[in-house]
A protein has these predicted regions:
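Active-site neighborhood of HAD-like aspartate-dependent phosphohydrolases
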Residues: 1-43, 68
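A metal-dependent, Asp-based hydrolase signature
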Residues: 48-79
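Alpha-helical elements of Rossmann-like donor-binding domains used by nucleotide-donor carbohydrate transfer enzymes
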Residues: 22, 26, 46, 60, ...
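Short, acidic loop-to-helix structural element flanking the phosphoryl-transfer center
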Residues: 67, 76-106, 147, 190
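Helical cap/lid subdomains and adjacent loops of hydrolase enzymes that gate the active-site channel
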Residues: 27, 36-41, 46-50, 74-90
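Short beta-strand segments
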Residues: 12, 17, 106-110, 168
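Asp-based, Mg2+/Mn2+-dependent phosphohydrolase catalytic module
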Residues: 1-5, 9, 112-113, 117-203
Length: 203
């Protein structure tokens, strides 16, 4: 495999640690309901998946979430809960900053559009270098492991599968990307990223 010209990185699980439970609890406190009610509204009823797939606008998503938990949720409250439940290690932050100085880097994440604001707030040092490089499923209109998610990401960067390294914590996503010809590697924790980049000749 040649040295990659593009590196596509998952966010949650690869670049950041993320706790659903912390997020649900944070939203529950701000809305005055139980965390389990938030979890059911987002996960059991498919609301989160529809937003992540681009089937709902941010306004529609927040309105439906508010209806489901019996309290209004605005974008600021949603982003605050997501930030509180997500952590980017300083070593990972520095690793991506250095990597982006050597090769094209994109973030390919199954998230809705509000996540753009969250990532910018969590790791401002990545910007403006990564402006235009955050490819969220809500904007792409496809979620990993759907082939369209990878194909649209490659088209966005004008890259070929054979020159692209893809790193994700999901074995299913890695297998789907590999099936399309990407050099796909699984990182089950953020600390694994540096090793993978070294193996690919990028560190």
């Amino acid at each position: 495999m040649p040295r990659p010209r593009l590196v596509l990185l998952d966010f949650d699980g690869v670049l950041a640690s993320y706790s659903h439970a912390v997020r649900f609890s944070h939203l529950a406190r701000s809305s005055g309901c139980a965390p389990e009610r938030v979890r059911r509204a987002l996960m059991d009823d498919g609301l989160e998946a529809r937003y992540d797939a681009g089937l709902l606008s941010t306004g529609e998503y927040l309105h439906q979430l508010g209806d489901a938990i019996g309290a209004g949720i605005d974008a600021a409250s949603w982003c605050a809960a997501r930030r509180a439940s997500t952590h980017v290690d300083p070593d990972t932050e520095a690793c991506v900053s250095a990597l982006a100085g050597r090769v094209a880097v994109g973030i390919l994440s199954n998230n809705g559009l509000l996540m753009c604001e969250v990532i910018r707030a969590l790791v401002p040092s990545w910007f403006p270098r990564l402006d235009g490089a955050m490819l969220l499923s809500g904007a792409l209109g496809a979620r990993k492991p759907e082939p369209a998610a990878f194909q649209r990401a490659l088209a966005h960067f004008g890259a070929s599968a054979g020159n692209t390294l893809f790193v994700d914590d999901s074995a299913t996503h890695v297998a789907a990307a590999a099936g399309l010809g990407l050099d796909a590697r699984q990182a089950e924790e953020p600390a694994a990223l540096q090793r993978i980049l070294s193996d690919a000749g990028l560190a």
